[in-house]
Amino acid sequence: AHRGDWRNFPENSLEGIENAIKMGVDIVELDVQRTQDGVLILMHDETLNRTTTGKGKVSEVTMDYISNLYLRNGCAIRTKHKVPTLEEALLLTKGRIMINLDKADRYFDEVYALLKKTGTVNQVIMKGGKSVEQVKGQYEKYLCEIIYMPIVSLDKLNAEQQIEQFCKDINPVAFELLFIKGNNELPKKIPAMLKGKSLIW
């Protein structure tokens, strides 16, 4: 469920997550931003303008300011729903649904601390577009506990080699694969290459 059940509730809202769970969804995708005072919240955009009644960059306002705002729905209409913190979302989903965290790897240490605090380490998928070397250098101490999903652009020249290297060094449960070029042959080739090794998102 992309940003929760965004068709019936505001994106990245607790109510949208709850409804996705009730619908029987296996994985809910959520986005993370950090406030000026270091609170991790659910928000796709870097600014509050599109999805809330507030204005400005998330990174330049406090959680106190955000707590007084209301979320807007897909038609930009104000709702009664509030902006949730990541911790609130983790507590809501604990033991109930897998979470695919987007835009969160830049806050890996802080996210991990919240996962440990809430007991949700085993139900969260962290992902990012970093190289194998960067992932090993920055996150290796977490990889034995956290599900990490590499994001690989198949339009890049070394995409196939990058996937092979990830399989060899990290053995990820899944890959998120992106491509735009219509003449790219890799989308046809990769499923066979990853069969029995990693899933494709």
Please place each PLM-identified region on the residue numbering.
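Phosphate-group recognition and catalysis centered on beta-loop-alpha active-site segments
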Residues: 1-201
